Amino acid sequence: MSGIIGKKVGMTSVYDAVGNYVPCTVIEAGPCVITQIKTVETDGYKAVQLAFDDKKEKSTTKPLLGHFKKAGVSPKRKLVEFKGFENELTLGQSLAAQDVFVEGDFVDVVGTAKGRGFQGVVKRHGFGGVGGQTHGQHNRARHAGSIGACSFPARVFKGTRMAGRMGNNRVKIQNLQILKVYPEHNLLVVSGSVPGSKNSYVLIEK
């Protein structure tokens, strides 16, 4: 599994060759630099560490400054490991979107979903509420209803769907097609939506 780090730019829409309307997401993918190459001999597994998005030196910790200096690159904000790069890579090498992907590829996109705060069961789990407001009912339309029996089992089971914090979790959207690659701007256009808000980091995995 090879991939690259990107930043969500926003959503738009295009028409495909047949004339179908396709909603899509624009992602700024790279350029990323290789800051570490892990091998079985030294680390116990094989992986490549990529870094993306420049960062001020004064905002970087000294251990990380040393790490970037060893790779011969300027400080970066986001560091992620990827496994599965087949071709030979060198420390400090730059990887752009067109080096990893071509138009028509199907990719998985990983990101952090927007935080929604404390939400009820209708929004959080898609409950239908408890029916019409009849027979005197006036304040239970969007409540969960029963969460268990009384004397048996005399407890609420783990995992029962209730109100609570929604979003702000890691989400992977699979099998999104790359509709267009713009090498001059390091942009990918993928079909559908991806998790996160504008300017949030995403991982594009092949």
From Swiss-Prot:
GO terms for cellular component: cytosolic large ribosomal subunit. SUPFAM superfamilies: Translation proteins. One of its GO terms (biological process) is translation. Transmembrane segments: none annotated. Gene3D superfamilies: 3.30.160.810, Translation factors. Disulfide bonds: none annotated. Keywords: Ribonucleoprotein, Ribosomal protein, RNA-binding, rRNA-binding. InterPro entries: Ribosomal_uL3, Ribosomal_uL3_bac/org-type, Transl_B-barrel_sf. GO terms for molecular function: rRNA binding; structural constituent of ribosome. One of the primary rRNA binding proteins, it binds directly near the 3'-end of the 23S rRNA, where it nucleates assembly of the 50S subunit. Part of the 50S ribosomal subunit. Forms a cluster with proteins L14 and L19. HAMAP family: Ribosomal_uL3_B. Belongs to the universal ribosomal protein uL3 family. This is Large ribosomal subunit protein uL3. It comes from Cytophaga hutchinsonii (strain ATCC 33406 / DSM 1761 / CIP 103989 / NBRC 15051 / NCIMB 9469 / D465).
